[in-house]
Amino acid sequence: MPRRQILSSEEQERLLVIPDDEIILTRMCFLNEQDIALINKHRRPANRLGFAVLLCYLRGPGFIPDKSNVPHSSVISRIASRLKLQPDLWPEYASREQTRWEHLTELYRYLKLSPFSRSLQKDCIRHLHPYAMRTDKGFMLAEEMLNWLHSNNVIFPSVDVIERTLAEAVTLADRAVFSALTAQLEKQHKSALDSLLKSEGEQASRLAWLLQPPGKINGKNVLQHIDRLNSIAALGLPDGITLSIHQNRLLKLAREGRKMSSRDLAKFTDVRRYATLVCVIQEAQATLTDEVIELHERILGTLFSRAKRTQAERLQLTGKLIQSKLKQYVTVGQALLHARESGEDPWAAIEDVLPWQEFINSLEETQFLSRKGNFDPLHLITEKYSTLRKYAPRMLSALQFIATPPAQTLSDALDTIRDMYRKQLRKVPPAAPTGFIPESWRKLVLTPSGIDRKYYEFCVMNELKGALRSGDIWVKGSRRYRNFDDYLIPAAEFEKSRHNDQLQLAVQTDCRAYLQARMTLLASRLEEVNAMALAGDLPDVDISDKGVKITPLENSVPSGASPFADLVYGMLPHPKITEILEEVDNWTGFTRHFAHLKNNNVRPKDGRLLLTTILADGINLGLTKMAESCPGATKSSLEGIQAWYIRDETYSAALAELVNAQKARPLAAFWGDGTTSSSDGQNFRVGSHGRYAGQVNLKYGQEPGVQIYTHISDQYSPFYAKVISRVRDSTHVLDGLLYHESDLEITEHYTDTAGFTEHVFALMHLLGFAFAPRIRDLHDKRLFIHGKAERYPGLQSVISTTSLNIKDIEAHWDEILRLAASIKQGTVTASLMIKKLASYPKQNGLAKALREIGRIERTLFMLDWFRDPGLRRRVQAGLNKGEARNALARAVFMHRLGEIRDRGLENQSYRASGLTLLTAAITLWNTVYIERAIESLKRKGIPINNQLVSHLSPLGWEHINLSGDYVWRNNIKLGSGKYRSLRTVDTELYKKQS
């Protein structure tokens, strides 16, 4: 049986490589006086150089250069310079094997190094075991192994020996994981797990049924999901069966199990099969729990939206009648006024303009029209009580809700409703909890005759939604609705990191010093902008008693930019999209990142099938239609590629490869240095099955859709994309900055109005990012200061009457640091925390304290916005790049009417990732050929204005064939280092125009 491969060939090459880093090379080549004395004992110059090189390698990186691993040229030249020798002596030394071994023996004694023996290998495997229990990624384990060898003064063995050691460590860890997951399983548990794999006739297996997505948003599907949860509970798996296993391992096993058919799972050895099924079931239970809650939230949202629409429709229908009644009562009122002034009989005056019986009828009609139900949609919500009643009893029975102290009253109300369902009570007990009921609900719920049951249930279930989002109530077994504290770094670990100054935050950890520095900066900036405002020196900004008026930026694009762009794009070849993908892969090798789910070193045998699958995602064609449009591809072969090679992490790594390649292009430096970026959401309509997964985001209208939130660098590379729900864009801004895998080092980020909240301002600052949103209603925003507004008369009209609450920050400083450190270290995602903070009631201390920091940072930003037109231009330019990229994405994502028709979030995510990868490939391809076009123009004597080059965009697509049959052609495949021919253009015409 072949040995398990742990490291890919690329990783093997990377493992023992000296980086081109001046500091590392300088440290490595340092020789002290004792070293020099030892080196000089050797007579021949070549021997002295060779001995010194071996010394530096053994003491530094820890391995020995040989014929297959030639020393770094900078190392040889530095050491030769230090010893006043010629660097070309190394080949002479390397040819003397016997001398080399004698020198190594001498160096082992001098450096007190030990060879890598079998006993040390066993010690190394024992050291690696806890790491291998957390991950089976070979390169991470290899780095840890080398660190252990170095710290124990052990000579690095060959890569082959390292690989064998890692393979043994990973295999032992695999067995330990399987054993730990199955140790508590009894015979009945194993029998129940095996029954999940069985199917009758054409029916799917029980396991396949458990893993089905929710489908349409209705009570029926909530009940089906609850049936699935109950089926999992009926398995009776021991509590905490997975607690001893690291989350990375659990997720990998669960992913493998979900991708495999029941028939393939049944072929596993018993211990591996049961371990895999346990992981799949535990993951499915958490997913089902979250999906039940999400279905409930969306059903409630639908019911409230429907009530609003019904109320609006009824109001519209009665509008004419209301208008006629108003006119009628104006007439009656005028008659009464006239009667009072003239002393006439008022009753007769009324009857003169309106017969008495008609007056009585009119009063009754008006009384009907003035019902609150005609103006407040809450009065109509109980018309759909049957929808809630259909699933609520079983949902409350199936899920275990646990409340924090602020939500205990609401938790008691849930118990009351659960008890009413169980006892089949018709009325709400008089002693039922009511303290949680908001003011807007109280008159509906608390009536003179007692508590209205329907409104009470609706109110409780609606308040539950908010409490779950904020974390005031959490759900046992959930992934998304856990206890808030469980998301954060453990308190003891946080204190240890803080004490050792390892929080990795961009601010001082001492609260007093931090606040003093920020208040000093704020006061200084206020004084500066106040003086400029009084003198009228703010560029294009006027601050008066009426507020702020900012003159829009003038178009700074040179008039020659458009003709120059036309000339350059006219020279670009006209490739098919398939040719672009293949050519970009030849340049970058991005497809090597699409590793097999079960073995990180396995790649698809047919690289073009992988590219075809990526293309199907990116152009929104789908696998079925792509198989019909691509000769040689079948639906089953594409599905196999998607099942085993397409994942979020493989897409992310491939995207990073393209972004890094773009960053390395000389032309990209004209557009930016890769330190600024922008982000924006793009809405795609949903159709077919996708309409069940689509959500309404009011920013894009009332129709459901799917939003893809994309981050793009100043070099036009989209470096992060994520499918987001109906929540505000700002929830996901930090995710792209923290979790992208490229080499970009973003320091400043731009968004539009939807991308900012004060919580985002605060966290951006704490994590070291300069945040610059383009705020549409900036004239309505206020500056927050600590002190009296009278000190700044030039800004008084835009200073808030509410002062900064510094005490809130001081009181919750430790919580703020712990939250920020947890996000920075990846313990929890930024988007999840921002979403929970936004859902907190106003009195929550942490949310309020973070808001105060956000107010400080937003005030500083607004002052910079007023005084610095350069900032305004940078933000505008950054957002323009994002909008241009969205236009390219819309053009690429053309099939199926541009609609997303996948109902599962996983497949929607693949669509977003494929689209982002495709636009990144087009951007890189355009950049390379624009460079070649410019070089060609230079050779023809055309003067190139660098300012015009900076205004070129690599986001054009008119020259690319995006439609038709998707054919991979062998006869026009380009060789290494070869490019397509540029097209001929009339440069004389351009000279005349310019």
From Swiss-Prot:
<dbReference type="GO" id="GO:0004803">
    <property type="term" value="F:transposase activity"/>
</dbReference>
<keyword id="KW-0233">DNA recombination</keyword>
<dbReference type="GO" id="GO:0003677">
    <property type="term" value="F:DNA binding"/>
</dbReference>
<comment type="similarity">
    <text>Belongs to the transposase 7 family.</text>
</comment>
<dbReference type="InterPro" id="IPR047653">
    <property type="entry name" value="Tn3-like_transpos"/>
</dbReference>
<dbReference type="InterPro" id="IPR025296">
    <property type="entry name" value="DUF4158"/>
</dbReference>
<dbReference type="InterPro" id="IPR002513">
    <property type="entry name" value="Tn3_Tnp_DDE_dom"/>
</dbReference>
<keyword id="KW-0815">Transposition</keyword>
<dbReference type="GO" id="GO:0006313">
    <property type="term" value="P:DNA transposition"/>
</dbReference>
<keyword id="KW-0814">Transposable element</keyword>
<protein>
    <recommendedName>
        <fullName>Transposase for transposon Tn2501</fullName>
    </recommendedName>
</protein>
<dbReference type="Pfam" id="PF13700">
    <property type="entry name" value="DUF4158"/>
</dbReference>
<comment type="function">
    <text>Required for transposition of transposon Tn2501.</text>
</comment>
<dbReference type="Pfam" id="PF01526">
    <property type="entry name" value="DDE_Tnp_Tn3"/>
</dbReference>
<keyword id="KW-0238">DNA-binding</keyword>
